[in-house]
Amino acid sequence: MRVDLFDFDLPEDSVALRPASPRDSARMLVVRPGGEPVLEDRGVLDLPSFLRQGDALVFNDTKVIPAQLEGVRYRGEHISTPVSLTLHMRVAPDRWKAFARPARRLKPGDRVSFGHGGNACLLGSLDAMVEEKGDAGEVTLRFDLSGPSLDEAIMSVGHIPLPPYIASKRADDARDRTDYQTVYAREEGAVAAPTAGLHFTDRLFAMLDEAGIERHFVTLHVGAGTFLPVKADDTDDHVMHEEIGHVDAVTAAKLNAVRERGGRVVCVGTTSLRLVESAAAEDGTIHAWSGATGIFITPGYRFRAAHMLMTNFHLPKSTLFMLVSAFAGLETMRDAYAHAIATGYRFYSYGDSSLLFRKD
């Protein structure tokens, strides 16, 4: 499909720079393809009223790490211009793949030192060597530290990697370390938050429990590739980034039991949906699964396991707007987004939410 079919005009002031407070006070646009009404303006706290006893919410419990690193490149005895690197996938205890800016100033063999400029690492300087250079600004870094020691150093010198549309408007601060993290995050490794989950609070969980809604957790470590623009003119020519995920056998069995008794699998966020669909067989049976997924969902995809999707509002021509268009229908989602923009919904990671029913 032509990528420009997924384009729309998004005013700059529609992008939220801070989350709603409290988290569960965000607005929620309910989208029912072919329903009456198709679009309904509600709030996140209304979520339980759209679910039935026995339905199951699926959350991504990945935890964001401060993966934005500001460093200085060394080549021989010469110090060059500062470089910025966003870690996006760990490939070994001492190695990370990262996106570099400006990538043209790095080559294999270069050394990069982090943690200077008043933010020194408590363990000493954090240094890495550029081991490989790939496409689209990607490099592989081999750090001098490894395992937990490296994790501690990254926590000390790193910054929360705010999405570009937010980072271009303001710098990250101490609030983001809390705001850009779900209350149930536990598995460290993401460099972007599963943002649909940011709306959940203890109050909302209590309401869902009272309504008899199950909750289950899977893990997909969201990578910085989620921010990459689609540069191809046709979706067939786009290469999707891969992310590491895991669905354990107990969770798979419980979700299959929900489906067998007529309950619905409600994915909280596109990351949960992509992982559940990666783990599902053609008949919708969900299996234990672990590995890298590069699943790219566009209109025409036949959903196997997910019945409903709660998700924030996405950017024009993004792979995530393509995904929601596949789920609820392109024209329905174009109408939904036009309504959201006209009525002041807040977009992107810190923005409002939508609840999508799957198109038949």
From Swiss-Prot:
Look at the named UniProt entry and state the broad enzyme category this protein falls under.
transferase
Instruction: Look up the record and name the pathway of this protein.
Output: tRNA modification; tRNA-queuosine biosynthesis
Q: Tell me one GO molecular function of this protein.
A: S-adenosylmethionine:tRNA ribosyltransferase-isomerase activity
Q: Indicate whether Transcription regulation appears among the record's keywords.
A: no
Please give the biological process terms from Gene Ontology that the record holds: queuosine biosynthetic process; tRNA wobble guanine modification
Catalytic activity line of the entry:
7-aminomethyl-7-carbaguanosine(34) in tRNA + S-adenosyl-L-methionine = epoxyqueuosine(34) in tRNA + adenine + L-methionine + 2 H(+)
A single Pfam family it belongs to is Queuosine_synth
Share what the entry says about its subunit structure, partners included. Answer: Monomer.
**Which NCBIfam families does the entry mention?**
PRK00147.1, queA
Q: What does this protein do?
A: Transfers and isomerizes the ribose moiety from AdoMet to the 7-aminomethyl group of 7-deazaguanine (preQ1-tRNA) to give epoxyqueuosine (oQ-tRNA).
Family in the record: Belongs to the QueA family.
Q: What is this protein called?
A: S-adenosylmethionine:tRNA ribosyltransferase-isomerase
What organism is listed for this UniProt entry?
Answer: Sinorhizobium medicae (strain WSM419)
Q: By which gene is this protein encoded? A: queA
